[in-house]
Amino acid sequence: MNKTAISIIVFFIGQILNAQTLEKMNWFNEPSSWEITDGKLKMSVTPKTDYWRISHYGFTVDDAPFYYAEYGGEFEAKLKISGDYKVRFDQAGMMIRLDHENYIKTGIEYVDGKYNLSTVVTHQTSDWSVIALDRPVDAIWIKAVRRLDAIEIFYSFDDKEYVMMRNAWMKANHPVKIGMFAACPDGDGFDVTFSDFTVTHLPDKVRTGWLEQNAE
């Protein structure tokens, strides 16, 4: 068997495993319409939903669709997002969630006719940071790396070159729910597709450091 044939087989095995992984995940606030095909999650986002706590606006909401799996330890997570954003605050991306008072949501958000790279970090109250884009984009990749008590967040337009957009605190040594979210605070919903979702375990830095210092 030549290398090309082996590469094709490995690719399709990866696609199958990815699809099986998506099938085993869980919903929080399941939307009325969604499907998983060919390793992609497609959903119609529930209208008038969001994730936010208290600050600036004075309200707390925790009712948008979130499709997740639970992971402990340190990891690198990545996904691709493509959405048909329509009105102000339409958003989609990755969420890393400890509980209803502690979470990070990051991805793309449509505000006043412009696309923004958006991150909301919530610990009791929410903050919001954005990077405005100078043009619409068909898709974006988000990557999150959890190390110790921090999560580094990166974006890419081609899944090759990644740029850091945020470094945020998250309590160490606690399992988190991680996956795909979308919200539509103002509108009547929109369609979004998630693909290439992966979570890769990373060896714990403290433990590996101890092993190195105490090698036989």
Q: What residues fall within each predicted segment?
A:
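Bacterial Sec-dependent N-terminal signal peptides
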Residues: 1-21
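Extracellular glycan-recognition regions
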Residues: 20-216
